[in-house]
C-alpha cells in the first residue's frame, strides 16, 4: 500500500526532526520524506545522512551477530536472538530499525558457558544482554520457546529467532513494561501486525493467562490507534480497540520527550539511598520518580482498563520503597 499524502510544512518538519533524530527514528523519518520535496530541505538532508550512517551500522551489527552465533555454537550453546536484528530484518531496510545491543536467550544450563563466551577476547566489541529467562514470557518454558523458534538467514550464518507468536508477545509486553516511551517499539508492532501470516496463532500469542492477554491486546490497540496498524483478524482487532482512552494519551505524553536520558534510572538525579545520608534535593528528585501509569500498571501486575491509575502508581512506589529498605535492614 502506498503511503498516504504527507501534509507537513517545512517549519513543522524542522521542529519534528530533532525528535526523530534523537529518538532513534531518523531512518523512518527519511524513509517517509524521501519521495517528497522535504528531502531537499536541510532537515531532510540531516535525516538522509543519519540513514546512511544507520545503514553502515546495520552491516556492522549483522557481522557481529554472525560472529556471536559462531562463537556460541563452537562451545555447544544454541542461543535465540531476541528483539533488535530479529525485528529489523523485517523492515524494508535494516537501517530503519536501529538497536544498540544483542539480546540473546540461552537455556539455563548453558548460561555459564554463554557468559564466558561473551566475556572472551573473541567477542570483544559485541554488546550482549544475556538472558536465561524472559520475564515478559514468564509463563512459557525455555523448551517451548526453543521448540517454536526457527532459523533465518543472517548473511552467511543461520540465526535462531523466536516463533512469531512468542516474539510478538515479548515485544508487546516489553513496550508496556518500559512505559512505551520509545516510538519505534510501537512501529515494530505495527509492522508485525500488517505483515502477519494467515496461520498466526493468536491463542498461543495471548496465552492462557488473562493478564498477559490483556497486556498484549492493549499493545495491539495502541499500534492501531497511534501508528494506524491494520490487521486481518477482525475479532482480535475489535477486542484491541477496547483499550481505555488514558492509555494512548499517556503514550503521546511520553513521546514529547522520547529520549533515553529522560527515562529512569538515567533521569534520576542521584541514587535514592544517597538521600538517607544527604537529604538535600530529595523532594525535587521525588517528582522525577513518579511512575509512568503504563509502567506502574505492569510493575504491580495490574490490568489495562478504565479504572484510575493512582493505586497502581502508589503500588509501584511502595514496591520500590520496599526494595530500598529491605536490603538496608538486612545489612544492619
Model-based region annotation:
Residues 1-100, 106-332:
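Conserved NTP-donor binding/palm subdomain of two-metal-ion nucleotidyltransferases/polymerases, i.e.
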Amino acid at each position: 500500500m502506498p503511503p498516504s499524502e504527507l501534509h507537513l510544512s517545512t517549519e513543522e518538519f524542522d521542529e519534528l526532526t530533532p525528535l526523530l533524530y534523537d529518538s532513534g527514528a531518523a531512518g523512518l523519518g527519511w524513509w517517509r520524506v524521501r519521495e517528497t520535496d522535504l528531502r531537499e530541505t536541510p532537515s531532510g538532508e540531516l535525516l538522509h545522512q543519519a540513514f546512511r550512517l544507520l545503514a553502515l551500522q546495520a552491516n556492522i551489527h549483522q557481522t557481529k551477530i554472525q560472529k556471536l552465533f559462531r562463537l556460541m555454537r563452537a562451545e555447544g550453546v544454541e542461543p535465540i536472538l531476541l528483539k533488535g536484528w530479529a525485528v529489523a530484518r523485517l523492515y524494508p531496510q535494516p537501517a530503519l530499525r536501529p538497536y544498540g545491543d544483542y539480546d540473546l536467550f540461552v537455556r539455563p544450563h548453558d548460561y555459564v558457558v554463554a557468559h564466558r563466551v561473551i566475556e572472551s577476547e573473541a567477542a570483544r566489541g559485541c554488546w550482549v544482554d544475556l538472558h536465561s529467562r524472559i520475564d515478559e514470557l514468564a509463563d512459557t518454558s525455555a523448551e517451548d520457546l526453543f521448540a517454536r523458534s526457527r532459523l533465518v538467514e543472517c548473511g552467511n550464518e543461520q540465526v535462531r529467532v523466536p516463533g512469531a507468536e512468542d516474539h510478538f508477545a515479548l515485544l508487546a509486553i516489553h513496550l508496556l513494561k518500559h512505559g512505551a516511551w520509545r516510538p519505534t517499539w510501537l512501529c515494530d508492532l505495527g509492522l508485525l501486525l500488517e505483515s502477519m501470516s494467515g496461520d498466526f496463532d493468536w491463542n498461543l500469542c495471548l496465552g492462557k493467562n488473562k493478564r498477559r492477554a490483556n497486556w498484549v491486546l492493549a499493545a495491539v490497540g495502541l499500534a492501531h490507534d497511534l501508528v494506524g496498524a491494520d490487521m486481518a483478524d477482525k475479532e482480535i482487532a475489535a477486542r484491541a480497540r477496547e483499550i481505555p482512552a488514558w492509555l494512548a494519551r499517556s503514550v503521546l505524553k511520553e513521546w514529547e520527550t522520547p529520549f533515553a536520558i529522560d527515562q529512569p534510572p538515567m533521569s534520576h538525579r542521584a541514587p535514592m539511598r544517597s538521600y538517607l545520608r544527604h537529604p538535600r534535593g530529595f523532594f525535587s528528585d521525588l517528582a522525577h520518580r513518579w511512575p509512568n501509569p503504563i509502567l506502574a500498571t505492569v510493575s504491580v501486575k495490574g490490568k489495562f482498563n478504565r479504572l484510575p491509575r493512582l493505586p497502581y502508581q502508589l503500588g509501584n512506589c511502595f514496591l520500590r520503597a520496599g526494595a530500598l529498605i529491605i536490603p538496608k535492614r538486612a545489612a544492619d
